[in-house]
A protein has these predicted regions:
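Periplasmic/cell-envelope proteins involved in peptidoglycan metabolism and beta-lactam response
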Residues: 1-56, 95, 145-153, 270-271, ...
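Beta-lactam-recognizing serine transpeptidase/beta-lactamase-like catalytic domain environment
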Residues: 35-78, 83-317
């Protein structure tokens, strides 16, 4: 038989469509599209991409075009909140808290966006409004051990192999010792502190919610090919999924994330049709421009369409200061492009 080539899971029309969206909306970041049913990677776009005609310039460019941003670790922010929501649903908890706009933990003040009080908040409303105070108190109620367990169940803190010799970074989870400090537990509860994750890990987490609570590890190799004939020689097998949350709780969580898009912080994520579910995130990086403005990682992660999701999508704009488009608006453009691609 001839030499072996490989067939990737990347769909050419989807990849091209997503590349076009990325080129017109972001200067630095990435967009990922997974097939919800299998977790196969259908598109992975990292911006800026390097210029193959001029590698020397690309190597010296300040915007690091050689980084595959989908596989690098970043501060996560509020896109982590569904992990707490899932842990709460699995524990049979749906508490109601009064949000005053700020929570004091261990002498530290943690504010909601703009310090706006949300009043009486239950779990769906906390996701919809992205209420930090609610998730801090939910984290206290769940406790450090069950939060860490939930994060690990969803694939955080461990390297994510996509193919032989090709993996997403493990990122970082806080240690139990760190989380023994109530301030650190509060930070972790809304996706800040020492938590780091790759966009591919965030995609796998949201895919679990979209796929009825079953975690499947994303992959990029579909089959080996006979290079002479171009025919598949062997379809590569992938580990079976493992259940992380019940199908019922996954459906409840999906409904909450659809509500976030319908009437919450992510209303510009709604594409032309089919509805969607998802979550915004703004993560502080601790890095500042010369003018003193903090650079943030702006996230949007979700699934499309709302009923029977076909695709799980993650958008990250890294180190952003002023952006022309929100992550949610870019997500909506991706949904429209997926619809057009068929």
């Amino acid at each position: 038989s001839g030499a072996l080539g490989v067939q990737l899971t990347i769909s050419r029309p989807v990849q091209r469509a997503v590349e076009a969206v990325a080129a017109s909306t972001m200067t630095s970041g990435c967009i990922l599209v997974l097939d919800t049913a299998t977790a196969a990677v259908r598109a992975s776009v990292s911006v800026p991409c390097y210029d193959p005609e001029n590698l020397a310039d690309s190597l010296q460019a300040e915007n690091s075009p050689f980084l595959n941003r989908a596989l690098q670790s970043y501060a996560v922010g509020s896109v982590f909140k569904p992990v707490l929501a899932a842990a709460a649903l699995e524990a049979g908890l749906q508490p109601v808290f009064e949000c005053t706009g700020a929570v004091v933990v261990d002498g530290q003040i943690f504010r909601c966006a703009g310090g706006v009080p949300h009043g009486q908040v239950d779990l769906p409303a906390a996701l919809e409004k992205s209420c930090n105070g609610y998730f801090i108190r939910l984290g206290q109620q769940l406790g450090a051990e069950s939060l860490l367990d939930a994060a690990k169940d969803f694939g955080f803190g461990q390297s994510l192999p996509l193919a032989e010799g090709f993996a997403a970074e493990a990122g970082q989870l806080p240690t139990p010792q760190e989380l023994a400090q109530s301030g650190q537990l509060a930070n972790f509860s809304f996706g800040q502190g020492s938590l780091l994750a790759a966009p591919m890990q965030v995609a796998a987490m949201f895919n679990t919610i979209a796929a009825d609570g079953v975690y499947r590890s994303p992959y990029v190799l579909q089959a080996t090919l006979d290079e002479t004939t171009g025919q598949p020689v062997e379809t590569l097998s992938h580990p079976r999924g493992r259940r992380v949350i019940s199908a019922q709780n996954a459906a409840l969580l999906r409904a909450m994330l659809v509500q976030v898009v319908q009437q919450g912080t992510a209303q510009d994520a709604a594409g032309r049709s089919g509805g969607a579910g998802g979550k915004t995130g703004t993560a502080q990086t601790g890095q500042f421009t010369p003018e003193g403005t903090e650079r943030c990682n702006l996230w949007f992660a979700g699934f499309w369409p709302a009923e029977k999701p076909r695709y799980t999508i993650v958008v990250l704009q890294d180190g952003a200061v002023h952006t022309a488009y929100s992550g949610a608006a870019i997500f909506a453009q991706v949904c429209n492009a997926l619809e057009a691609a068929g």
